[in-house]
């Protein structure tokens, strides 16, 4: 099959024209605006050595406009059984132009508050961390679609007035989650280490009364390389043993499946 006949008509192969799909099929636009901002403040507390607090706020707005305009691509096959030859017309894609437009806007916010402690007493080092975090996301969107345009004007109000060719939609939703976390650590002479941590998280995915879960973890460590009986092993510069255990949650699935 010819890509293009001598009279300028587009050829096709099994009903498709790659050239026509590239240059005559319409367009798709998705311009988007996104801003990621973060503000943090940290302060050492002078009345307790090694104690500090920190606050973080993230503000992330996002906006996207989508517009998809599909136009018919006429393709032709040559019928050599007739005299003179006849060109048989077909279409790739819709037989009349279609237009689909949508708009979505979202705002994501994250709030964090932290208190941190770290201090060494001789050979003993004690650390502690407490965190509270809240996240929220608000989303709005709307869409409109028109089929079977009789005029080649790519605007919603220029589309068909037949109810079967019209569809509109829109929705909005909110996402929320909150978490509390802690970590306590102890280190003796960089040889013996212990750490206990945990999270208490809540997420909007789950049914009221079952949205929160506690996830603990602990670890023990032994830095053998710092022991006196290892000092002469110059060919080994690091050797540690560690035992740890932890639990974590799972956000598999999607929101409101409990309904």
Where are the predicted features?
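Short glycine/threonine-rich loop-to-helix capping motif typified by GTGT followed
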Residues: 208-212
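Outer-membrane beta-barrel signature, preferentially recognizing the C-terminal barrel domain
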Residues: 161-181, 247, 259
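Outer-membrane beta-barrel transmembrane strands
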Residues: 15-68, 98-120, 127, 139-141, ...
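Short coil turns and loop connectors of transmembrane beta-barrels in diderm outer membranes
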Residues: 47-49, 122-124, 136, 190, ...
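Transmembrane beta-strands of outer-membrane beta-barrel pores
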Residues: 57-65, 132-138, 198-204, 224-226, ...
């Amino acid at each position: 099959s010819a890509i293009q006949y001598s009279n300028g008509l587009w050829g096709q192969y099994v009903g498709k024209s790659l050239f026509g799909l590239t240059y005559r099929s319409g367009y798709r636009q998705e311009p988007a605006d996104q801003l990621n901002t973060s503000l943090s403040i940290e302060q050492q507390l002078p009345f307790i050595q090694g104690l500090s607090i920190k606050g973080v706020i993230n503000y992330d707005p996002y906006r996207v406009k989508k517009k998809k305009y599909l136009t018919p691509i006429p393709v032709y096959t040559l019928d050599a059984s007739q005299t003179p030859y006849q060109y048989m017309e077909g279409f790739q894609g819709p037989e009349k132009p279609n237009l689909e437009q949508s708009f979505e806007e979202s705002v994501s916010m994250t709030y964090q508050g932290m208190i941190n402690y770290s201090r060494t007493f001789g050979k003993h080092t004690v650390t502690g961390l407490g965190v509270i975090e809240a996240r929220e996301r608000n989303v709005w969107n709307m869409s409109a679609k028109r089929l079977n345009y009789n005029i080649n004007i790519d605007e919603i109000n220029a589309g068909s007035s037949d109810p079967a060719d019209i569809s509109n939609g829109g929705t909005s939703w909110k996402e929320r989650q909150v978490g509390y976390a802690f970590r306590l650590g102890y280190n003796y002479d960089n040889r013996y280490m212990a750490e206990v941590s945990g999270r208490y998280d809540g997420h909007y995915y789950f049914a009221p009364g079952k949205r929160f879960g506690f996830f603990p973890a602990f670890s023990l460590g032994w830095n053998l390389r710092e022991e006196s009986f290892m000092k002469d092993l110059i060919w080994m510069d690091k050797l540690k043993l560690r035992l740890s255990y932890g639990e974590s949650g799972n956000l598999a699935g999607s929101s409101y499946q409990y309904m």
